[in-house]
């Protein structure tokens, strides 16, 4: 977990990733996929897939060791997460990002609002997960998400 924490922190100072409490990372540790350097055993990158509803998931907290950028680690992480989504039967994957070209290379497109029926929206309002609140674009989290782009991929 310390390695994931360090990767996240490397991108939150310039607000390229939303800051997360360490307890939140621990609560979601089973959602993470971690890329490990085979030579030295260090964590090179991470990313998580959070299922929100029967047909909807979010890719979140994708981070690569800054010294290893450009090595396609992020691409491999997102590819694995999309494969996991397919295996789970998820048909749509959401992300909230500044990296629109990166996610666009996978087929993500920009969206407005929360692409769920009102009945699902009402159920999602009951979630305590901050990422779900960000997906719903709730007023209380808007200061955290300023400048981010909402994107969706249909699998």
What are these regions (language model features)?
Residues 18-21, 78-81, 137-138:
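A generic local structural motif
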Residues 1-20, 36-37, 42, 147-155:
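Short amphipathic alpha-helix that is part of the acyltransferase structural core
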Residues 6, 83, 101:
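Surface-exposed charge patches
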Residues 86-88, 92-155:
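Terminal substrate-recognition subdomain of acyl/acetyltransferases
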């Amino acid at each position: 977990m310390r390695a994931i924490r360090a990767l996240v922190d490397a991108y939150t100072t310039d607000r390229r990733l939303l800051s997360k409490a360490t307890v939140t990372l621990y609560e979601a540790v089973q959602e993470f996929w971690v890329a490990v350097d085979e030579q030295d055993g260090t964590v090179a990158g991470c990313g998580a897939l959070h299922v929100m509803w029967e047909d909807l998931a979010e890719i979140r907290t994708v981070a690569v060791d800054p010294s290893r950028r450009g090595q396609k680690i992020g691409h491999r992480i997102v590819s694995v997460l999309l494969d996991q989504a397919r295996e789970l039967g998820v048909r749509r994957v959401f992300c909230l990002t500044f990296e629109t070209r990166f996610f666009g290379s996978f087929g993500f497109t920009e969206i407005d609002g929360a692409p769920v029926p009102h009945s699902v929206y009402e159920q999602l309002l009951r979630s305590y997960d901050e990422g779900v609140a960000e997906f719903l674009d709730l007023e209380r989290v808007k200061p955290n998400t300023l400048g981010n782009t909402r994107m969706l991929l249909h699998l």
